[in-house]
Curated annotation (Swiss-Prot):
SUPFAM superfamilies: Ferredoxin reductase-like, C-terminal NADP-linked domain (SSF52343), Riboflavin synthase domain-like (SSF63380). FAD binds at R52, P53, I54, S55, I69, Y70, R71, G76, T77. This is Dihydroorotate dehydrogenase B (NAD(+)), electron transfer subunit. It comes from Lysinibacillus sphaericus (strain C3-41). Binds 1 [2Fe-2S] cluster per subunit. Heterotetramer of 2 PyrK and 2 PyrD type B subunits. Belongs to the PyrK family. NCBIfam families: PRK00054.1-2 (NF000797), PRK00054.1-4 (NF000799).
């Protein structure tokens, strides 16, 4: 159930160039699942007006804390980056349908593919898959080394490959270069990132079960404004879906790419 709460800042730190890790404390954490997101009001003033959708990177229900990782590049997220321990942040959430962690049986293997700021939600997903006895393989793509993050955290959960467009870290090129050269064996894949990457994955693994998390610009975050609609394929009855309320995670092949 979506609720609004003023959550307390536990910590905030910069972990890469313009990339921030923000941990908040509050009751909303108890309802969160991997792949969902929250809509954050970055300031108590009227400007910026719209909330910012940010994915959930880590969930700690024992301590009522969750972590977001975001890029501070626009006016709103730059304001959010000024928050310090003890301050409050107005959060609406959790929103959307997350990743189905039960899609992989115990003893199976999941391939997790992320690109840029689509990487964070895969961290909590990998944690929960590991807890169910599932092996995880991570292929994570970034533009350059200076914007890479969470290498130790992902490596602690499973086999991890980093890819950068300029070759400054890991394999040079795109995530598909690693998938071609390594040809990992797996049962189900999960992915979050830019549309070209998601489209490439669908073409790469036409026979595999997969789940894609979409990154779309959003206005309201609750399905009222229709700012984030995507056209569907003929696999489902709807002509269009809303990424915020119907997604952001969809089974492979249901959204037209």
């Amino acid at each position: 159930m979506i609720r609004q709460e003023k959550m307390r800042v536990v910590s905030q730190k910069q972990i890469a160039t313009n990339i921030f890790e923000l941990t908040l404390h509050g009751e909303l954490v108890q309802d969160m699942t991997p792949g969902q997101f929250v809509h954050v009001k970055v300031s108590d003033s009227l400007e910026p007006l719209l909330r910012r959708p940010i994915s959930i990177a880590n969930i700690d229900k024992d301590n009522n804390e969750f972590t977001m990782i975001y890029r501070a590049e626009g006016r709103g997220t730059k304001v959010l980056a000024t928050n310090r321990e003890g301050q409050q942040v107005n959060v609406l959430g959790p929103i959307g349908n997350g990743f189905p962690v039960d899609a992989v049986k115990e003893g199976g293997t999941a391939l997790l593919v992320g690109g840029g700021i689509g990487v964070p939600p895969l961290h909590e997903l990998s944690k929960q898959l590991n807890a169910r006895g599932v092996k995880t393989i991570h292929v994570l793509g970034f533009q350059t080394e200076d914007v890479c993050f969470y290498e130790e955290e992902f490596s602690a959960l499973g086999e991890t490959h980093y890819v950068t467009v300029d070759g400054s870290k890991g394999t040079k090129g795109f995530v598909t270069n690693v998938l071609e050269s390594r040809a990992p064996e797996f049962d189900v894949f999960y992915s979050c990132g830019p549309l070209p990457m998601l489209k490439a994955l669908e073409g790469f693994y036409p026979e595999k079960e997969g789940y894609l998390s979409f990154e779309e610009r959003m206005g309201c975050g609750i399905g009222a404004c229709f700012a984030c609609v995507c056209k569907t394929t003929d696999q489902i009855a709807k002509d269009y879906v809303k990424v915020c309320s119907d997604g952001p995670v969809f089974p492979k092949g249901t959204v037209a790419l």
